[in-house]
Amino acid sequence: RGTNDIEKLIDLLGGTYRQQNVVCARAFDAAIGCVDTRSGATLWTTPARGVTGIAGDAEHLYGVESDGRVRAWQTADGARAWVSERLRWRQLTGPLVLGRSVVVGDETGLVHMLSREDGAALNRLSTDGSAIVATPVAAGNTLVVVTRNGGVFGFMPE
């Protein structure tokens, strides 16, 4: 995009994925792609309209689109693996890969856990009812989320 170097600059969003010499990232509201860090060659890119970072594993990259669709792409070539429409228009956070789940928070303080395999709903956790304001993080064996009202919630598997 653009005709000169300045116009071609794009904002990359935090929340990237790295496996050996491959780094994958999302460009603000434009695309997702992977680059070989040794050669600098672009391995693949695909359109992806989102404003949060991505997460990944050896099989898939996960991201939230601007409209709330949660998507998975094949890490190897960017082909679409699955899309979940069930959380549309909920102002989702960026994703976290945790165990067998992709975890996102929403504007109502709910934490959603989707299957990494197919995007099916696995679980939903409640907080204080205010928006989750940052991408969930894992601290050891604890899932941690922060809400707009200042709540810090930790969830541990039983």
Predicted regions and their residues:
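Structural signature of WD-repeat beta-propellers
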Residues: 27-28, 65-66, 106-107, 147-148
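C-terminal hydrophobic structural anchor segments
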Residues: 92-116
